[in-house]
Amino acid sequence: RASSIKVAEAAKVIENAQRDINIAFVNELAVIFNKMGINTLDVLEAAGTKWNFLNFRPGLVGGHCIGVDPYYLAYKAQELGYHPEVILAGRRINDHMGKYVAENLIKQLIRTGSSVRDAKVLIMGLTFKEDVPDIRNTKVIDIIRELEEYGVNVLVCDPYADQEQVYHEYGLSLSQF
């Protein structure tokens, strides 16, 4: 139980900022391990044998809370004259992951001798997290837009997302799968 509304709000913001930072750490590890040729999920599985290991997975961080609340905290800190380096570093890492995923897909296409321009890529899932209809601040759009810049024909399907809302927010037509 929080002692005041300020304490309750601060608690909620740090819960989301902490999750954001933990995911950013694992995202950064995924980038490093990818460069080393090591499977990140294998590393995380092995690390998970330690009783106090925090089980986070690499991925996109969007939505209306986790990808936003750290900025509220950072803004307030800066307003008070403090520069929150870890919080902002986490945001930078997570905000870059869509581009990173797209660039890795492009590299895979090139390595396999596939044509990048006019390649067809199916993205299964647009909402900011699984099994919900919420598309607010979805970072999947970053992957889509980056692939489109390379001339990739991107098809998107998501049975949870509302077709009209997706078109209104992102100008995308969902494909049926």
Stretch-by-stretch model annotation:
Residues 1-177:
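Structural/interface elements that position substrates and couple domains in central-metabolism enzymes
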